[in-house]
């Protein structure tokens, strides 16, 4: 029952230029990074490859043994067939093929284990990376795109490792081994098979060079498609409210069409390879049969050599199909690896491990000293913000949309680095405090009520352990939730789900109760009553007054009636403080705050 926030930015799915795709920035580099990521599994992978190579050697021995059987049978047609010799060869073949089957099973099992561990490692890396990325990254990247990297791209990499790594090695070995065996058997027939098969290589390389850009585009459009679906699903009510179903459907159709186009092109290119390799293989097979028949009639080779060559041609051409499929999978893996490692290598927040540990005792004195900030150098939001907040004061920050209210809170929480000036808590600059410590100092109640699937107890005690029912009762009484919760069959253990229809006000009260349980020394209340009715607003306001008592609090609100009792009101406009004082003082001035306040009552 979580409420997912929509990402800031443009319209969902509007990802920029309508380009069907482009080549990977660094195809070899992406594969190189993936190979280095698999370094802990090198020994196991080598064992799997060696097992696969042993299986290939066994398959290469088979045609030679079958050739011997054929020659023994052919020679016996004029007299007596040497059955003991044939039985001996057959037993040898059975043993070899059983060993080959066991090696194949072992290779598949080992690569499955390696693949799962690599996938888990990549997902763990992405999960840990998320906690080290700045807030600005998530404001410029859709949630669906990040999810696509965690799921689709990692799965693509895993499938390539499992299905293509060993097959690529075995295909190369089989190709080289079959060439050696054919040349050692009869060079004329070997050249016939090789020349007739080489036609496929040029075509395969040409297709590969043209298809890579479509595989890259497919992964990118898949990320956009996931992002669009995730946003429209979570914001479905808003879409219906504004009658934007047709507009969103058109956006979905556009992205889905691009996805279909690039997917069709990539699969079309991929689909060309297998029929092409099949044709080349059959053509080589026919050529070998014709040339072999001529040589046999001339007495140059025996009939057993023709039989062996028929099998060697299959062994020679089948790696071409495997190489084609492996090349296709590698292109998909390269595109996926590029996106995954692009995320893993994204710029992180600065390392703060060198900062000294801070004391837990906090008075709550906050000073803003000529703070300056801009999301970009040419877009300054906060020009010169200075203010001193005493311990325990309740400070309200008001102003029109875009004035910089939420930006100041983000700077106070160290979500963004300052562009200039300094913020101090109890005389200690934020630059000398770790982000984790700053976050521990503040409890937050936001307009967007974030509740996750789980019990009411889990949501109220989020991040806290050892909270008793008595403590929960005390907090829920203070927030007006006690009666609601105790009328539920499971009480605090009731699971939040779609069946439990909590109102917006009840959800807001739960977030206030959660902040009470957190018991942080300072508070940030961001427009916590702007989406509820007047009666619920009064309940929330009472709970907030209880919550802020004795704590340094920063309140951002559009409803100015909720901050009358604030110790200080800061009026912001265009990133600067234009007025400061109590509610009564600001009304007496008759300035911008008075205009805002009076306009709200005129509208009411």
Mark where each language-model region is.
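Membrane-integrated ABC transporters
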Residues: 1-59, 74-93, 107-111, 115, ...
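Short intracellular "coupling" helices and adjacent cytoplasmic loop segments at the cytosolic face
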Residues: 14-22, 116, 124-148, 152-154, ...
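An intracellular "coupling" helix at the cytosolic face of ABC transporter transmembrane type-1 domains
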Residues: 40, 135-136, 154-161, 165, ...
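Transmembrane helices of ABC transporter permease
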Residues: 44-57, 68, 96, 163-217, ...
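Helix-loop-helix
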Residues: 75-77, 82, 181-195, 265-338, ...
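Hydrophobic alpha-helical transmembrane segments of ABC transporter permease domains
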Residues: 91, 103, 107, 115, ...
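Cytoplasmic juxtamembrane "membrane-exit" helices immediately C-terminal to transmembrane segments
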Residues: 109-117, 121, 184, 202-224, ...
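ABC-type nucleotide-binding domain
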Residues: 352-353, 359-604
């Amino acid at each position: 029952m979580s409420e997912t926030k929509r990402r800031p930015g443009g319209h969902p799915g509007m990802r920029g230029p309508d380009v069907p795709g482009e080549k990977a920035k660094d195809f070899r580099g992406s594969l190189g990074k993936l190979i280095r990521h698999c370094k802990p599994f090198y020994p196991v992978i080598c064992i799997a490859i060696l097992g696969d190579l042993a299986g290939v050697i066994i398959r290469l021995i088979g045609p030679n043994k079958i050739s011997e059987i054929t020659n023994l049978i052919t020679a016996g047609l004029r007299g007596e067939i040497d059955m003991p010799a044939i039985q001996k060869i057959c037993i040898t073949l059975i043993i070899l093929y059983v060993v080959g089957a066991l090696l194949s099973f072992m290779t598949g099992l080992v690569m499955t284990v390696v693949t799962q561990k690599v996938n888990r490692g990549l997902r763990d890396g992405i999960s840990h990376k998320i906690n080290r990325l700045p807030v600005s990254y998530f404001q410029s990247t859709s949630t669906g795109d990040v999810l696509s990297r965690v799921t689709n791209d990692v799965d693509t990499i895993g499938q390539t490792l499992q299905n293509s790594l060993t097959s690529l090695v075995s295909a190369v070995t089989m190709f080289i081994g079959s060439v050696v065996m054919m040349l050692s058997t009869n060079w004329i027939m070997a050249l016939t098979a090789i020349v007739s098969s080489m036609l496929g290589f040029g075509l395969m390389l040409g297709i590969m060079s043209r298809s890579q850009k479509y595989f890259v585009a497919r992964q990118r459009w898949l990320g956009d498609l996931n992002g669009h679906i995730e946003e429209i699903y979570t914001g479905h009510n808003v879409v219906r409210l504004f009658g934007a179903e047709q507009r969103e459907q058109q956006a979905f159709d556009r992205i889905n069409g691009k996805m279909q186009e690039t997917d069709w092109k990539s699969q079309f290119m991929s689909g060309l390879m297998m029929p092409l390799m099949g044709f080349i293989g059959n053509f080589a097979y026919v050529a070998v049969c014709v040339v072999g028949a001529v040589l046999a009639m001339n007495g140059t080779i025996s009939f057993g050599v023709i039989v062996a060559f028929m099998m060697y041609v299959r062994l020679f051409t089948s790696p071409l199909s495997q190489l084609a499929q492996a090349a296709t999978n590698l292109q998909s893996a390269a595109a996926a690896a590029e996106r995954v490692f692009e995320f893993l290598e994204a710029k992180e927040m600065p390392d703060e491990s060198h900062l000294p540990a801070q004391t837990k005792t906090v008075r709550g004195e906050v000073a803003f000293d000529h703070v300056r900030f801009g999301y970009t150098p040419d877009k300054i939001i906060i020009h010169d913000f200075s203010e001193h907040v005493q311990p325990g004061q309740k400070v309200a920050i008001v102003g029109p949309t875009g004035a910089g209210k939420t930006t100041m809170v983000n700077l106070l929480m160290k979500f963004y680095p300052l562009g200039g000036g300094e913020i101090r808590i109890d005389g200690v600059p934020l630059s000398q405090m770790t982000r984790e410590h700053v976050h521990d100092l503040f409890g937050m109640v936001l307009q967007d009520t974030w509740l996750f699937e789980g019990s009411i107890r889990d949501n109220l005690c989020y991040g806290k352990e050892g909270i008793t029912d008595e403590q929960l009762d005390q907090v829920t009484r203070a927030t007006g939730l006690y009666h609601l919760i105790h009328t539920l069959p499971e009480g605090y253990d009731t699971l939040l789900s779609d069946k439990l229809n909590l109102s917006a006000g009840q959800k807001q009260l739960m977030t206030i109760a959660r902040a009470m349980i957190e018991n942080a020394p300072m508070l940030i209340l961001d427009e916590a009553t702007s989406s509820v009715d007047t009666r619920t607003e009064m309940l929330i306001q009472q709970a907030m007054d209880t919550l802020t008592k004795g704590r340094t609090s920063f309140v951002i609100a559009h409803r100015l009636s909720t901050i009358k009792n604030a110790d200080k009101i800061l009026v912001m406009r265009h990133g600067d403080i234009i007025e400061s004082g109590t509610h009564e003082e600001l009304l007496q001035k008759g300035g911008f705050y008075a205009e805002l306040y009076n306009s709200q009552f005129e509208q009411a």
